[in-house]
Every structure is written in structure tokens, then in C-alpha cells.
């Protein structure tokens, strides 16, 4: 693969370690990612056809959050060498020398094992098994293998980030139904255009670290075409909950308008290929994609959790 990545030695690239404070250990958990995981898991629980005891639900969400944090921590432990090279990550606790790698490894493993065991005891072992699979997939399959080996890294690795709704549904029902699967697919297809939009702007940073992101391997033009292709899949897929009966009028409007906006922004990325306008188009898509996913899942949460569900008469005949 990349000689640069393989030649990086954490002992050589990381600053001398000192004692980290609580904020540094919390930063290892990637709190923004953790919040998104909890949110999508909550939606997975909410759209399930049955209900769960509120205490069990709250404990389960906490354990899902801890498991997600463990994944982030183990990812930062493994990626400390390349984090030290990339501009946007060099201030993270390990490359900045505030936390030693072995401290992060121990912290991550304890959280991973503890979260899985507690989720199994609080809810059920299917949910715990899915959480364990998510942690292993993100840490071993994505972080340790795919991220440095293939331009399809975030496509395949995106499965880890798409699993929380299925875990949430498993907490409630002890199984995984069509609702959890559809939400998984929405996040899975959303992931490539979201990350590749950022990669178009940060391609030099990724190249410096030796990470084979799509723009660096297939080129920016191919990446732009693939962004449009995935968005063409995402827009109609976002309407699937309406067709399957667990998304109503509010959700349908959000999915329709949001999907159209995603298409418009992806086409702008495809057209604007040089200079500042190209970067602006890519960052606009990147930023809106976050809002799109948030609004999509918020609409489901509002309809199912707050009783705002209004079926679309046309689809009901």
C-alpha cells in the first residue's frame, strides 16, 4: 500500500506523553459521532412495532453510546500515527502527547467489553451481539485493514456506522425487522457521498497520511460521478419508510425535499471541478448531508415518538 503510512512509527511521530485530563479521555470517545450513534439507535427503537421499559431503554442507549465511544477510542489508538501527520487530527489527545497509546488501548477495551456485557444483561444478547460486531467491524475491519488498504474503505466500513438503528430495534423486539434494515440502508448509502465530499477538499491531507481515499485513487472526476450515483440511490431510498408504512406525511415531505436538495448539491459538485467554487460546492454537500440525515431521522422520531404520524392517503388508496 502506501510506504508513508507503513513507515510511520507512533514512537517517532507522537509527542512525549503526559497525563491527560477527563476532557482528553472524553475526546477519545469521538463525542459527536457518539451522539449521532445514540440518536439513530433511539430512532431504531422508536420505529419498532413494540415498546420497551423506559429504564431498560435508557440503560441500553447509554451502553450503545459507551460502545460507540469505545470504537472511537480504539480507532484513535490505532490511527495515532496518521493522526500525527494530518492537519485536522494532529491535535487529538494521543498524537498531541496528552494521552499515551497504551492508556487509550486499555480505556477502549474496558469500555468495549463493559458496554457489550451490560447491554446483554439489560436488554438481550442479540442487541449485545450486534454491538460487539459493530465495535469489532469498525476497529478491526475498517480501522486496521480497509482504511489503509482500499479506496472503498468508507463504503464497506460504513456498515459499522449504519448498524445502530438495528441495535436499537433489537433492544426493543429481540429481533431485527424491516424498519431497522431500511434505516441501516439509508445510512449506508448516505455515507459515501458524505465522506467523499469532504475527501475532495482534504485530498492533500489524506495523501500526506497515505490514506487511499477515492479522490486520491480514482481521481476527483470519478469521485464526483460516484457521489452523484450514490445520491441517486439515496433519494428514493429515503422514501422507503413511507412506502412501508412507518413514515408518514411529515417524514415524506422531509425525505422528498431533502433528497431533491441532496441531488442538486451533488450535481453542483459534479459541475464545479476547479478552484474555490469546487471546494465550496463539496463543503456545501458535506454540510447539508449531515442536516439531511438529522432531519430525516428527526421526522421519524417526531412522528413515532410524539404521535405526529399522519399517513399519506394516496399511498393507502
Curated annotation (Swiss-Prot):
Q: Show the Pfam families listed in the entry.
A: UbiA (PF01040)
The protein's topology relative to the membrane is: Multi-pass membrane protein
> Which EC class is the enzyme in?
transferase
Gene3D superfamilies reported for this sequence: UbiA prenyltransferase
Keyword presence, Cell inner membrane: yes
Which key words are in the record? Answer: Cell inner membrane, Cell membrane, Heme biosynthesis, Membrane, Transferase, Transmembrane, Transmembrane helix
Q: Which InterPro entries match?
A: Protohaem_IX_farnesylTrfase, UbiA_prenyltransferase, UbiA_prenylTrfase_CS, UbiA_sf
GO terms of biological process kind: heme O biosynthetic process
Q: Which GO terms describe its cellular component?
A: plasma membrane
Q: What is its main location?
A: membrane
Superkingdom of origin organism: Bacteria
Q: Which GO terms describe its molecular function?
A: protoheme IX farnesyltransferase activity
Any stretches that span the bilayer, and where are they? 25-45, 54-74, 117-137, 167-189, 244-264, 281-301
Q: What is its EC number?
A: 2.5.1.141
Q: Which PANTHER family match?
A: 4-HYDROXYBENZOATE SOLANESYLTRANSFERASE, PROTOHEME IX FARNESYLTRANSFERASE, MITOCHONDRIAL
Q: What else is known?
A: Carbon 2 of the heme B porphyrin ring is defined according to the Fischer nomenclature.
Q: To which protein family does this belong?
A: Belongs to the UbiA prenyltransferase family. Protoheme IX farnesyltransferase subfamily.
What is the recorded name of this protein? Protoheme IX farnesyltransferase
Q: Which organism is it from?
A: Methylobacterium nodulans (strain LMG 21967 / CNCM I-2342 / ORS 2060)
